[in-house]
Design a protein with these regions (language model features):
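Short coil/turn segments at secondary-structure boundaries
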Residues: 133-139, 154-163, 187-194, 243-256, ...
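C-terminal or mid-to-C-terminal helical accessory/interaction module adjacent to the motor/catalytic core
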Residues: 70, 115-199, 246-253
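Long, highly charged, low-complexity internal segments
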Residues: 24, 33-54, 166-289, 328-330, ...
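Short, conserved phosphate-binding/catalytic loop or strand-edge motifs used
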Residues: 113-118, 262-263, 283-305
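Extended, highly charged linker/hinge segments and catalytic-adjacent loops that couple domains
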Residues: 131-134, 147-149, 157, 232, ...
Length: 368
């Protein structure tokens, strides 16, 4: 028997259908350990040594994992392919090692960018080790969260009783907001007016124009400081005769927007649908983990926490075939556009962009 550990029950349910009876898929329900809220959980004087503690919520799920691990030949850590997923895999492995349950057992780290049968099977066939740099990044972030929050929050509570705790990110964000508000408070507003002229041609079509010169002088932002300046300008231009002396046209090319990253997905969902970031990510999480389609649980999008804009070769081939079959070669570029343009600086950028797992599925079919 092989034990596969993921972080969520929805993901476990989907993967279990793909792998069959030789595998048991269990969920850790997120992180299983954390730094206890007490002094000394991170020791800066001792190479930032960190003390981890299993939280009460995770104990019952860890019992299920440990019981299954005892009877398993192989432990497969299949948590999400990002920093937090790598950290969960590391915590689970460390916990099982402390319980002396890994002796004579294989431990593999498996990742997949989408929850489809092909991707899961390919991930199982190509295991790797836990990535230490991602774990180090998680530890650095968690240590900073603790050190900032644990040391600053008590000071904050004495100054502002009943306030929330101070954090690594929100404390800096609050500073930026404060500085911006101070700039707004000292800002001295300055009045200015703009002047546009709307002409009509012999076909009664409107032509919108902007005044760029008046009496030989260039019109700038603050040329018209008040309504009197505008009235003076109007009296000069109303009775003049105007002619079109030259027409020039330019062709502008605009590339389509790049594939979605986490931030651009959230921005578009906000501007187009009015969704907040939390709602957007909840919906994306469901689409990633899978929904039931004709009795089968299928992941509809790739992993939704990514800074990368690259797309796999298989997906590009699928997209190009779809365009050719449905729209013709007129809409198919000779070469696929490259939006990354550089080597990924970190693991988040190395992930694929957010994309549909199967381009042939469309919203209308999903409604049926």
């Amino acid at each position: 028997m092989n034990l596969v550990i993921v972080e969520s029950p929805a993901k476990a349910k989907t993967i279990n259908k793909y792998l069959g009876s030789d595998y048991t898929v269990l969920a850790s329900y997120g992180h299983i350990r954390d730094l206890p809220s007490k002094n000394g959980s991170v020791d800066p004087e001792n190479d930032f040594k960190m003390i981890w503690e299993v939280d009460s919520f995770s104990k019952k799920y860890l019992k299920e994992i440990t019981d299954s691990a005892k009877d398993s030949k192989k432990i497969i850590l299949a948590t999400d392919p990002d920093r937090e997923g790598e950290a969960i895999a590391w915590h689970v492995k460390e916990f099982l090692e402390e319980k002396k349950l890994l002796k004579d057992k294989e431990v593999e780290r498996v990742v997949f960018n989408e929850i489809t049968k092909k991707a899961v099977t390919n991930g199982i066939d190509n295991p790797r080790k836990i990535e230490p740099h991602l774990v180090d990044a998680y530890m650095a972030r968690r240590a900073l969260d603790y050190l900032v929050g644990f040391n600053i929050s008590p000071i904050l509570w004495t100054k502002l009783p009943g306030s929330k705790s101070a954090g690594r990110v929100q404390s800096v964000a609050l500073r930026l907001l404060t500085e911006r508000e101070q700039e707004i408070e000292v800002f001295q507003p300055k009045e200015f007016w703009t002047l546009n002229i709307i002409f009509k041609n012999n076909k009664n079509e409107k032509i919108n124009t902007t005044i760029s010169q008046l009496d030989g002088n260039k019109v700038e932002k603050f040329s018209f400081k008040n309504k009197q300046d505008i009235n003076d300008a109007l009296s000069k231009i109303k009775n003049k005769k105007y002619n079109i002396t030259d027409i020039s046209s330019k062709t502008y090319n605009r590339n389509p927007s790049g594939p979605f990253t986490t931030s651009t997905l959230q921005q578009t969902a906000s501007s187009k649908l009015g969704f907040g970031a939390s709602r957007t990510m909840q919906i994306a999480q469901r689409l990633y983990q899978g929904i039931d389609i004709e009795g089968e649980t299928v992941g509809l999008i790739t992993y939704m926490r990514t800074d990368g804009t690259n797309i796999s070769k298989d997906a590009i081939t699928s997209f190009r075939d779809f365009i050719m079959q449905n729209y013709g070669d007129k809409y198919l570029p000779e070469q696929p556009l490259n939006y990354s343009g550089k080597k990924a600086k970190n693991a988040q950028e190395a992930h694929e962009a957010i994309r549909p797992t199967e381009i042939i599925r469309n919203p209308e079919d999903m409604k049926k």
